[in-house]
Amino acid sequence: MLLFPRRTNIAFFKTTGIFANFPLLGRTITTSPSFLTHKLSKEVTRASTSPPRPKRIVVAITGATGVALGIRLLQVLKELSVETHLVISKWGAATMKYETDWEPHDVAALATKTYSVRDVSACISSGSFQHDGMIVVPCSMKSLAAIRIGFTEDLITRAADVSIKENRKLLLVTRETPLSSIHLENMLSLCRAGVIIFPPVPAFYTRPKSLHDLLEQSVGRILDCFGIHADTFPRWEGIKSK
């Protein structure tokens, strides 16, 4: 670290006896411009040669019905080699056991990294942690309300709050019907803040033959919002005469 400008007159220090305690200060400090240029060049080269960061998505599963959507989303993202960071709420885990044959630890194995919903110190709770978006699937009305007012009581709502403040993409797969005016106002407020509200409404033009077909279409449309192409369902090509 340079203590003085490029070339410093240090007569004052010689007369005060400071060099008795700091002998190195008795030398004239000279910094070569070529040295600074070389050091800056090394730093730029190091930054430019850093490996590119993989596509990274934060996924949260809350306690609304439709947990199969979250599971299928994780499966597809893994197939596409997308890095995933997963948080499952207490009631998300309970709903998972009730609606599917999956156990939370099996679903966690689909993700690149998982976190406890209580661990608000996890990396995804910080704006300095870079990611390409967050998906809450399914998103309960409780989670929707908490995110809308910035009530960050757990890691899911904190990570969502950070995504909003950092202007990163946040998509909520809201699962409830019918919707009250409170639900709709919460959705409208978040939509105005740039959040994507994604009710998993199935498309029947695909002629779904099973629950799996319905999941494929919804998951594919979710990923469309993040610029991730998943060839999981037939896309609309206009009405064709038979």
From Swiss-Prot:
<dbReference type="GO" id="GO:0005739">
    <property type="term" value="C:mitochondrion"/>
</dbReference>
<feature type="binding site">
    <location>
        <position position="89"/>
    </location>
    <ligand>
        <name>FMN</name>
    </ligand>
</feature>
<dbReference type="GO" id="GO:0046281">
    <property type="term" value="P:cinnamic acid catabolic process"/>
</dbReference>
<keyword id="KW-0285">Flavoprotein</keyword>
<dbReference type="InterPro" id="IPR036551">
    <property type="entry name" value="Flavin_trans-like"/>
</dbReference>
<dbReference type="GO" id="GO:0009056">
    <property type="term" value="P:catabolic process"/>
</dbReference>
<dbReference type="GO" id="GO:0034599">
    <property type="term" value="P:cellular response to oxidative stress"/>
</dbReference>
<keyword id="KW-0637">Prenyltransferase</keyword>
<dbReference type="GO" id="GO:0106141">
    <property type="term" value="F:flavin prenyltransferase activity"/>
</dbReference>
<protein>
    <recommendedName>
        <fullName>Flavin prenyltransferase PAD1, mitochondrial</fullName>
        <ecNumber>2.5.1.129</ecNumber>
    </recommendedName>
</protein>
<comment type="function">
    <text>Flavin prenyltransferase that catalyzes the synthesis of the prenylated FMN cofactor (prenyl-FMN) for the ferulic acid decarboxylase FDC1/ubiD. The prenyltransferase is metal-independent and links a dimethylallyl moiety from dimethylallyl monophosphate (DMAP) to the flavin N5 and C6 atoms of FMN. Involved in the decarboxylation of phenylacrylic acids like ferulic acid, p-coumaric acid or cinnamic acid, producing the corresponding vinyl derivatives which play the role of aroma metabolites.</text>
</comment>
<feature type="binding site">
    <location>
        <position position="205"/>
    </location>
    <ligand>
        <name>dimethylallyl phosphate</name>
    </ligand>
</feature>
<comment type="subunit">
    <text>Oligomer.</text>
</comment>
<feature type="binding site">
    <location>
        <position position="221"/>
    </location>
    <ligand>
        <name>dimethylallyl phosphate</name>
    </ligand>
</feature>
<keyword id="KW-0694">RNA-binding</keyword>
<dbReference type="InterPro" id="IPR003382">
    <property type="entry name" value="Flavoprotein"/>
</dbReference>
<dbReference type="Pfam" id="PF02441">
    <property type="entry name" value="Flavoprotein"/>
</dbReference>
<keyword id="KW-0496">Mitochondrion</keyword>
<feature type="binding site">
    <location>
        <begin position="63"/>
        <end position="65"/>
    </location>
    <ligand>
        <name>FMN</name>
    </ligand>
</feature>
<keyword id="KW-0809">Transit peptide</keyword>
<feature type="transit peptide" description="Mitochondrion">
    <location>
        <begin position="1"/>
        <end position="58"/>
    </location>
</feature>
<dbReference type="InterPro" id="IPR004507">
    <property type="entry name" value="UbiX-like"/>
</dbReference>
<comment type="similarity">
    <text>Belongs to the UbiX/PAD1 family.</text>
</comment>
<dbReference type="GO" id="GO:0016831">
    <property type="term" value="F:carboxy-lyase activity"/>
</dbReference>
<feature type="binding site">
    <location>
        <begin position="140"/>
        <end position="143"/>
    </location>
    <ligand>
        <name>FMN</name>
    </ligand>
</feature>
<dbReference type="GO" id="GO:0003729">
    <property type="term" value="F:mRNA binding"/>
</dbReference>
<keyword id="KW-0808">Transferase</keyword>
<keyword id="KW-0288">FMN</keyword>
<feature type="binding site">
    <location>
        <position position="175"/>
    </location>
    <ligand>
        <name>FMN</name>
    </ligand>
</feature>
